């Protein structure tokens, strides 16, 4: 299956050659990849000009984005705002061969809520328009993980927590990430173990596997950099992700060896087909969210 071959090449980081005369195969690949988050990664490996011409976001654009984000981080540090970058930005910046390999649309930045005064001072000093949403955090219906979403050269999503709940704004995963972080290529990021946990949490619990196969590649890249298995095991257990991690590792290893089971093959194809799609049947969580918004609408 084409989806299996695409994902295997990306995981193995192998160049991909296609017969320039094989128009049907080229069309099939570009059709599959056109909305996929791993499209640039595959296209950067591809030797076919016909396929490479379909890559809308190239290396230079991501290099510029990363320079801008590093400048934002520097200014946050100058204001002594504790922060770490999560999700796409650190992965693009430090875990992939080319920055453009890992597509992201927003820069997700987790900040320490204890520094909220200094954070808003940073926003005002840099003329970044905001709504001072901090004043809404105690509202019953306020369930968003992002404190401020600011449209600049790169969309900046400033988060106060990683996991979402209808209770308080407390988040153990966020506390771990702000406490156990390192600096990679000039950006503060959670430890590899926490970054992997966040990746798995978002894929399974937040996105319900609708984010596609990118979480498999992210996980493989993080693990390749090195993780402390004992520490990782403890964190995964805390967030009920142990079994999902084991299944993910098994899937990646089998796929790289070319011994994936039929069940795994069907699962991967499903990831490709369902990326970005919404379920017709809303989850209990989505229903509860909508009810909460009716009773106490978000203030913006």
Functional labels for PLM-detected ranges:
Residues 1-105, 111-300:
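Conserved NTP-donor binding/palm subdomain of two-metal-ion nucleotidyltransferases/polymerases, i.e.
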């Amino acid at each position: 299956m084409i989806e299996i071959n695409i994902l295997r090449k990306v995981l193995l980081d192998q160049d991909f050659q296609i017969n320039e005369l094989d128009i049907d195969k080229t069309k099939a690949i570009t059709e599959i990849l056109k909305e996929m988050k791993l499209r640039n990664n595959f296209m950067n490996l591809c030797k076919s000009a016909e396929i490479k011409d379909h890559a809308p976001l190239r290396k230079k654009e991501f290099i510029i984005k990363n320079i801008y984000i590093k400048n934002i981080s520097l200014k946050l540090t100058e204001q002594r705002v504790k922060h770490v970058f999560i999700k796409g930005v650190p992965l693009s910046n430090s875990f992939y061969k080319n920055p453009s390999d890992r597509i992201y649309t927003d820069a997700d930045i987790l900040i320490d809520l204890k520094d909220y005064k200094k954070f808003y001072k940073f926003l005002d000093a840099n003329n970044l328009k905001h709504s001072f949403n901090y004043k809404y955090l105690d509202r019953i219906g306020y369930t968003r993980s992002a404190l401020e979403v600011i449209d600049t050269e790169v969309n900046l999503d400033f988060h106060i927590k990683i996991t979402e709940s209808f209770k308080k704004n407390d988040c153990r995963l966020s506390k771990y990430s702000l406490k156990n972080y390192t600096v990679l290529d000039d950006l503060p990021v959670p430890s590899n173990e926490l970054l992997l946990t966040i990746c798995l949490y978002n894929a399974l619990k937040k996105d319900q596997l609708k984010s596609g196969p990118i979480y498999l590649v992210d996980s493989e890249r993080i693990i390749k950099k090195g993780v402390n298995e004992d520490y990782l095991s403890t964190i995964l257990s805390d967030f009920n992700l142990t079994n999902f991690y084991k299944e993910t590792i098994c899937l990646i290893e089998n796929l790289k060896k070319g011994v994936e089971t039929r069940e795994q093959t069907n699962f991967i194809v499903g990831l490709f087909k369902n990326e970005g799609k919404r379920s017709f049947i809303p989850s209990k969580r989505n229903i509860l969210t909508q009810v909460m918004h009716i009773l106490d609408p978000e203030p913006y």
